Amino acid sequence: MRFYIGLMAALMLTSILRTDSASVGQTGTKSELALIERVIRQRDAADVKPVARHNDGPGRDPAPCCQHPIETCCRR
């Protein structure tokens, strides 16, 4: 009888420890993803460099234009 009680207590303790470690891992994963997304956004913002347009003829605007594909900072 003591064996079964000890076995049940060990199983309950193991299941409690598993759920605690799983919840810590999930919150850690969310914060890690947020950190990675922030680093990527900062890197993308730093990669935006103005590049001079080709001034082929009269009437062309020689203002710098961003290379970033998402940004629309090229005004015509």
Swiss-Prot record:
Keywords: Disulfide bond, Hydroxylation, Ion channel impairing toxin, Neurotoxin, Secreted, Signal, Toxin
Entry PTM: Contains 2 disulfide bonds that can be either 'C1-C3, C2-C4' or 'C1-C4, C2-C3', since these disulfide connectivities have been observed for conotoxins with cysteine framework V (for examples, see AC P0DQQ7 and AC P81755).
Signal peptide residue numbers: 1-22
Entry's Gene Ontology cellular component terms: extracellular region
Location of this chain's protein in the cell: Secreted
Propeptide: 23-42
Domains as described in the record: The cysteine framework is V (CC-CC).
Protein role: Probable neurotoxin with unknown target. Possibly targets ion channels.
Descriptive protein name: Conotoxin Cal5a L2
